UniProtKB/Swiss-Prot annotation:
Keyword Repeat tagged: yes
PROSITE patterns xrefs: KRAB, ZINC_FINGER_C2H2_1, ZINC_FINGER_C2H2_2
Native organism: Homo sapiens (Human)
Protein's recorded name: Zinc finger protein 212
Swiss-Prot/TrEMBL keywords: DNA-binding, Metal-binding, Nucleus, Repeat, Transcription, Transcription regulation, Zinc, Zinc-finger
UniProt region (Disordered), positions on chain: 1-29, 264-290, 337-361, 476-495
Length: 495
């Protein structure tokens, strides 16, 4: 029964028929199903890939945006710094611009003041330093009082020489006040300076001159009481005397006063009353008895006299003319002029009274010691002995040869005749013209030209030019006598 069951089953299978329509339908269904599933999967994968790409692009854009924001922040910080710097620079520029505007205003004021001064023809005020605020230069009251104000019409009516005189007077007054430091001071100091000037002017012997000429105000006069080597002992600030009238000139020259004429060291101090002067631009002042030994140019005559003060540094005084001297030798030279020995003339210079340096008389020493061989003479016996040794060393023929070759007055001779420090130009060979620093070198050189060999050996009759060569040759003979063999290749002597 068991065996028959599978057989039956086989039979059933064989008995069922297979239709062709059922198989293709199932295959198509399956294939369509698989195709749809594959398509859906690929679309999903593609969508996922597209999303991933979008994400990557968005991430890149986000990173670029972050970088841009960082750079923008940096630029913003730099811009803030630049804005601060520009603000500081603008503040400095504004400050500079403000100072420039102020200076421009001052320059405009000065230009206006200069134009006004040029219109009024006050050219001398242009030399004054301008004010701190650009105002016109301030002139002291004394200078304003000295000046004379002219209108344009009056100035045009003046002649050229009057205009020039006015300019010179105002310039001189200005220079005087500047030198006295009156200008540029406060009003109190300026008034004090003018009061001092007025007091000094009132003390002077000269007052106001009578009318009849152009009056020129005399300024301050100083007397320098310092040492004698100062540039000037007195100075007088005054105008030229050519503007004074003849009457004023006589009155000017007739005042009795004295003038101090200080000189440098070694010169004399002269005194002469002013009353004996001649009113001229230059005059010679000197000793009363000898007309003068020093010419003093008086370019400007001073109205105030200066009293003579004795100088303690000049103790020697002449009893006749009362001139003092610094040195006793100057006084002795001056006294000779009074006695008539060596009267000094006005043409003699002022250095004639100065002490001259004493020079020792250079006496020639007699040459007493003479050489018998070459007839040379010497002042010392030691030099002669040294010279004779040279003759003994050079042999008997050397003295005769030297005597024939050199004249007695020649500079080229043996070492005993010439000092060691002679110039090379004096030691020249007469044969070839070569120069030598020592006479012995010249003698050896000239033996080459003459062929002379004064040093000869007594044993082998060889002769040599120098004594040193002879001594070396004699050592060879000494070795031969001692039985010492000569070294091979060594010469027997120097010929």
């Amino acid at each position: 029964m068991a065996e028959s069951a599978p057989a039956r089953h086989r039979r059933k299978r064989r008995s069922t028929p297979l239709t062709s329509s059922t198989l293709p339908s199932q295959a198509t269904e399956k294939s369509s199903y698989f195709q749809t599933t594959e398509i859906s999967l690929w679309t999903v994968v593609a969508a996922i890939q597209a999303v991933e790409k979008k994400m990557e692009s968005q991430a890149a854009r986000l990173q670029s945006l972050e970088g841009r924001t960082g750079t923008a922040e940096k630029k913003l910080a730099d811009c803030e710094k630049m804005a601060v710097e520009f603000g500081n620079q603008l503040e400095g520029k504004w400050a500079v611009l403000g100072t420039l505007l102020q200076e421009y205003g001052l320059l405009q004021r000065r230009l206006e003041n200069v134009e006004n001064l040029l219109r009024n023809r006050n050219f001398w005020i242009l030399r004054l330093p301008p004010g701190s605020k650009g105002e016109a230069p301030k002139v002291s009251r004394s200078l304003e009082n000295d000046g004379v104000c002219f209108t344009e019409q009056e100035w045009e009516n003046l002649e050229d020489w009057q205009k020039e005189l006015y300019r010179n007077v105002m310039e001189s007054n200005y220079e005087t006040l500047v030198s006295l430091k009156v200008l540029g001071q406060t009003e109190g100091e300026a008034e004090l300076g003018t009061e001092m000037l007025g007091d000094l002017e009132e003390e002077g012997p000269g007052g106001a001159h009578p009318a009849g000429g152009v009056m020129i105000k005399q300024e301050l006069q100083y007397t320098q009481e310092g040492p004698a080597d100062l540039p000037g002992e007195f100075s007088c600030i005054a105008e030229e005397q050519a503007f004074l009238s003849p009457e004023q000139t006589e009155l000017w020259g007739g005042q009795g006063s004295s003038v101090l004429l200080e000189t440098g060291p070694g010169d004399s101090t002269l005194e002469e009353p002013v009353g004996s002067r001649v009113p001229s631009s230059s005059r010679t002042v000197g000793c009363p008895k000898q007309k003068s030994h020093r010419q003093v140019q008086l370019d400007q005559e001073c109205g105030q006299g200066l009293k003579l003060k004795k100088d303690t540094s000049r103790p020697y005084e002449c009893s006749e003319c009362e001139i003092t001297f610094r040195y006793k030798q100057q006084l002795a030279t001056h006294l000779r002029s009074h006695s008539g020995w060596g009267s000094c003339t006005p043409e003699e210079p002022e250095e004639s009274l100065r002490p001259r340096p004493r020079l020792k008389p250079q006496t020639k020493k007699a040459k007493l010691h003479q050489c018998d061989v070459c007839l040379r003479s010497f002042s010392c016996k030691v030099s002669l002995v040294t010279h004779q040794r040279c003759h003994l060393q050079e042999g008997p023929s050397a003295g005769q040869h030297v005597q024939e070759r050199f004249s007695p007055n020649s500079l080229v001779a043996l070492p005993g005749h010439i000092p060691w420090r002679k110039s090379r130009s004096s030691l020249i060979c007469g044969y070839c013209g070569k120069s030598f620093s020592h006479p012995s070198d010249l003698v050896r050189h000239q033996r080459i030209h003459t062929g002379e060999r004064p040093y000869s050996c007594t044993e082998c009759e060889k002769s040599f030019v120098q004594k040193q060569h002879l001594l070396q040759h004699q050592k060879i003979h000494q070795r031969e006598r001692g039985g010492l063999a000569l070294e091979p290749g060594r010469p027997n002597g120097l010929l």
